[in-house]
Amino acid sequence: MWIYILVGIICLLAGLAGGFFIARRYMMSYLKNNPPINEQMLQMMMAQMGQKPSQKKINQMMSAMNKQQEKEKPKKTKK
């Protein structure tokens, strides 16, 4: 009788771990394919703040944001 409970708990833990890693992988690929901010959104935000966005300025801000994301990646993988 106790073996069924033990097997059930082990299966539950394995399912939770598997689900977590599948969901994590899905979200990583989703965010890589669909970044949370793009050039059009950045241009609109700058216009709302009263700045006239030039393409050079937008490219600089996008590259700075990408560098920041790349810098944060190694910190997350070490944990």
Swiss-Prot record:
The UniProt transmembrane annotation reads 2-22
Query: Where does this one sit in the cell?
Result: Cell membrane
Coiled-coil ranges per the record? none
InterPro entries tied to this protein: UPF0154
Keyword Membrane assigned to the entry: answer is yes
Arranged from A to Z, the UniProt key words for this protein are: Cell membrane, Membrane, Transmembrane, Transmembrane helix
Q: How does it sit in the membrane?
A: Single-pass membrane protein
Name one matching Pfam family.
Answer: UPF0154
Q: Name one GO cellular component term.
A: plasma membrane
Q: What NCBIfam families is this protein classified in? A: PRK01844.1 (NF002503)
What family is this protein classified in? Belongs to the UPF0154 family.
Name of the protein: UPF0154 protein Lm4b_01315
